[in-house]
């Protein structure tokens, strides 16, 4: 079970969350977001992070973009020392292919905001391009980090060819039924472990890992 904590803005919190057991940290590269961090701010955080997770695997550092230009994505990856790119907008399979060609060693995560079963049908063309999928709640006002949950039963028959993250309104209180119902490859949390946007609640993060540890033993 891969655990990604998204919306990291502060070096000390990033280090603490990695130390508590995170497999991946996410940095919001969408300027309209209250969790937005510049490439230089990301670099300050990533330089402070441990290189490995508690499992002894590489700690992945993911930049989250939405309908961004390819040059901006490449620059942010290089300056921020990122190991992954999450595309959370309306990026086409062709654009995803361009990202892969430009950044072949970087993990490509394609996110989908699920409105209905029809959204799941749109995923197929991306499975030959992306490394990982992420399924999030759909809200018209924001791209993510809203705290909104959604109808997870839509995913009961979801069997993609790629590993996938479940996101959207997850908290330490509801993560157990989410994981046991759907058995995703990973979970992605942001607002569910925050005091305010970009300010993580380390006690909630600790509770989350206690829940996950109980499930995977």
UniProtKB/Swiss-Prot annotation:
Gene3D superfamilies: Aldolase class I. GO terms for biological process: L-tryptophan biosynthetic process. Its EC number is 5.3.1.24. It comes from the Bacteria. GO terms for molecular function: phosphoribosylanthranilate isomerase activity. Keywords: Amino-acid biosynthesis, Aromatic amino acid biosynthesis, Isomerase, Tryptophan biosynthesis. It catalyses: N-(5-phospho-beta-D-ribosyl)anthranilate = 1-(2-carboxyphenylamino)-1-deoxy-D-ribulose 5-phosphate. Pathway: Amino-acid biosynthesis; L-tryptophan biosynthesis; L-tryptophan from chorismate: step 3/5. Belongs to the TrpF family. NCBIfam families: PRK01222.1-4. This is N-(5'-phosphoribosyl)anthranilate isomerase. The gene is trpF.
């Amino acid at each position: 079970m891969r655990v990604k904590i998204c919306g990291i803005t502060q070096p000390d919190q990033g280090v603490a969350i990695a130390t508590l057991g995170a497999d991946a940290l996410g940095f919001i590269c969408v300027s309209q977001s209250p969790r937005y961090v510049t490439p230089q701010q990301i670099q300050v955080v990533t330089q402070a992070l441990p290189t490995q997770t508690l499992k002894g695997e590489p700690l992945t550092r993911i930049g989250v973009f939405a309908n961004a230009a390819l040059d901006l994505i490449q620059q942010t990856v290089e300056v921020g020392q990122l190991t992954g790119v999450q595309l959370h907008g309306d990026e086409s399979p062709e654009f995803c292919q361009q990202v892969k060609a430009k950044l072949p060693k970087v993990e490509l995560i394609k996110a989908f905001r699920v409105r209905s079963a029809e959204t799941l049908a749109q995923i197929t063309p991306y499975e030959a391009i992306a490394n990982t999928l992420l399924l999030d709640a759909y809200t018209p006002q924001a791209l993510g980090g809203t705290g909104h949950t959604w109808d997870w039963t839509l995913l009961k028959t979801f069997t993609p060819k790629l590993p996938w993250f479940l996101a959207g309104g997850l908290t330490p209180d509801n993560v157990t039924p989410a994981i046991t119902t759907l058995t995703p490859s990973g979970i992605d949390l942001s607002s569910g472990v925050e005091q305010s946007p970009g300010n993580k609640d380390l006690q909630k993060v600790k509770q989350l890992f206690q829940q996950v540890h109980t499930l995977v033993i």
